[in-house]
Each structure stands twice: as structure tokens, then as C-alpha cells.
């Protein structure tokens, strides 16, 4: 990969969000409880940006994998309290969430974790080149970008060419 435009970035799958919004709950027994964002760093996983002060948001329990897996971790994530326009992939990392500090967890094509390439970025480094390097590793198909301290899921990244080559590919976070 030669540029950040070679990246396929995915927020929470809009179909999964539709179920959450229509049911009024996150599927883990938690009802949606809207509140006003403080604007003090609430990263929205629906549109991959930080919430602005006063925006109506909610906290849900979310697992990036929606299929049986020993790597299924449920954790708290912020989303808008009502459906938004979502994240429109640009081939680049989402601007407000494109730097460290972050934990980068690597997964193989079968969604098993590749421990050997998991990376902790402790400074405010640009994640693009680091993620590109990780996706260039033979066994790495997807990188999950997570917050540093609580390690909450932010978004997933795959190589655009790998996603385009697989015509049967669904969401990279299943």
C-alpha cells in the first residue's frame, strides 16, 4: 500500500445501528438513554468523529464481532442518540480519530487475533503509516483501532484492495 487512500475504514455497521435504534436497546440488555455530550472527548462510532457539546448521544454496549468468537469483547461505545448520516468511507482514516494514543489490534482473515503484530501507539503519531505497515504483514487482514487506556473499539481498517478483491466481502467487522 502506498497511501492512506488505500485504506477501507468501517464504523459500526449501519444495519446493526438500525436494529439498535429501532429496538431502543443495544442487544445486551441496555436501553438507549440519550444525554447531551460534553464535547470533552466522546468519540462517536456511528460517524467516526468527536461529539460536539450539546449533541444528543448515548452509550451502548458493542462487540465488533457479531458471530461466535473467543475474541468477542463487549464494551461501551458512544453513538448519536438518533440515526445520523453515518461515516462515508474516504479511503483515509477519519480525521479526528487518526492519531494516537491508540491500541491497534490485528486480526487474520478468519477473525482470530494476530498477537504478534498488536501495536500500542503512546504518542500523537499519525496512525495511517502504522496501520499500512500492519496491513502489509502477510497474516494481518484487519486492524481494530481502540482507545489506549480502556481499549474501547473505535473502528476497523482493512486494505481497500483486499476488500475490493473479495466480491463476497460483507462488512469487515462481522
Task: Show which residues each predicted segment covers.
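Compositionally biased, non-globular sequence tracts
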Residues: 1, 38, 43, 172-174
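Polar/acidic, low-complexity leader/linker segments enriched in S/T/G and N/D
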Residues: 1-7, 12
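Short, hydrophobic/π-rich interface segment
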Residues: 105-142, 146, 159-161
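Short intrinsically disordered coil segments
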Residues: 93-96, 119-122, 170-174
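Intrinsically disordered, low-complexity acidic/polar segments
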Residues: 68, 88, 113, 164-166
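Short Gly/Ser/Thr- and Asp/Glu-enriched loop/turn motifs at secondary-structure junctions
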Residues: 147-152
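C-terminal edge-of-domain segments
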Residues: 153-163, 168, 172
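N-terminal, charged amphipathic alpha-helical interaction modules
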Residues: 12-95, 99-103
Amino acid at each position: 500500500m502506498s497511501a492512506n487512500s488505500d485504506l477501507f475504514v468501517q464504523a459500526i455497521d449501519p444495519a446493526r445501528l438500525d436494529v439498535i435504534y429501532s429496538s431502543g436497546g443495544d442487544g445486551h440488555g441496555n436501553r438507549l438513554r440519550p444525554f447531551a455530550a460534553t464535547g470533552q472527548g466522546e468519540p462517536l462510532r456511528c460517524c467516526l468523529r468527536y461529539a460536539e457539546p450539546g449533541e444528543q448521544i448515548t452509550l451502548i454496549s458493542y462487540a465488533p464481532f457479531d458471530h461466535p468468537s473467543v475474541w468477542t469483547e463487549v464494551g461501551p461505545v458512544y453513538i448519536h442518540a438518533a440515526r445520523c448520516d453515518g461515516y462515508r468511507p474516504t479511503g483515509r482514516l477519519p480525521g479526528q480519530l487518526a492519531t494516537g494514543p491508540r491500541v491497534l489490534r490485528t486480526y487474520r482473515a478468519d477473525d482470530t487475533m494476530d498477537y504478534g503484530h498488536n501495536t500500542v501507539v503512546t504518542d500523537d503519531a499519525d496512525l495511517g503509516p502504522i496501520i499500512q505497515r500492519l496491513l502489509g504483514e502477510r497474516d494481518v487482514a484487519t486492524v481494530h483501532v481502540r482507545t489506549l487506556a480502556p481499549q474501547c473499539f473505535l473502528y476497523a481498517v482493512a486494505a481497500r484492495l483486499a476488500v475490493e478483491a473479495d466480491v463476497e466481502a460483507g462488512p469487515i467487522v462481522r
